[in-house]
């Protein structure tokens, strides 16, 4: 039952308070009552951990969610702050998980590799030459982060090391139609099938013909926008042997499934996401009690009418755990962390680490 008061909590179907500035849910109230999928313990703990991450990184705000990777049930969905800090006279309710659309950056790289495998544009053992650490596309130069040069690498390493040049070389193998169709297959640019949601499908470059720079941009998560629920939906395919699950907030809602990958290709991507933690861009999580598979994402923030803002980033981490037998998907996104420490592996990934410890202690894992 949803508490319809103006306090900052709702009640679960057990009558327990679910904290986290979530008056948003009061809009879902109906005369019959609703059985929400939200879990009291996870909702409260995730809200506290998100607040800590935002404070530690001196960020503007952020959001996080936990989804059951098998059923699609949203177990926790929090954002902070849920008001406009520039207007102290008026509290403006805002659920960033739903309302914040951003360019997801490198979180899209596994989707691009998965599509290339599906279309036989590459093989799992294809060698991609990323020398000399940059590539010229349609008159634009694109370089590896930090001036790195990964040399000759495999598709799995393109994911784990988050190679811009590697994913660009794969992306330009797609036709314009193939690139767009692959992203739509994984739900990007598509509405979520949630009846309570004031739906927005995000944006994607709509030029009939995509130049190489356009395809590369889409391949590494620019020129399209997504919210965290869409990302959780996409990553569920890697957790479920190629079957994508539609997120749901009401227990009685139907679980909607769609196969988007073969079991073999999904397993390959999941293993690549495990390597991101073992030896890649989120290696700070490799000694955690629960084995995590995941992908870091750090994108420059685009501001309408201004363009890409200097030293303003969206730092994200998409995770699947336990990596060997997935049960949960968690997406964390931090808005404008300190520009001196802004990578997703440093800012967002620690939230996942702390939550998995908490979930193991409480026997969720």
Model-assigned labels for residue ranges:
Residues 1-11:
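Core domains of carbohydrate- and sulfate-ester-processing enzymes
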Residues 12-23, 38, 64-106, 111-334, ...:
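Beta-lactam-recognizing serine transpeptidase/beta-lactamase-like catalytic domain environment
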Residues 19-62:
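Conserved, well-ordered alpha-helix/loop/beta-strand core segments that scaffold catalytic motifs
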Residues 39, 43, 231, 344-356:
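Short, charged, low-complexity patches
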Residues 46, 158, 352:
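A helicase ATPase "motif cassette" and its flanking acidic/Ser/Thr-rich regulatory loops
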Residues 257, 349-365:
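Short, gly/Ser/Thr-rich active-site loops of penicillin-recognizing serine hydrolases
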Residues 339-340:
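Short beta-strands and strand-coil junctions in structured, solvent-facing domains, enriched
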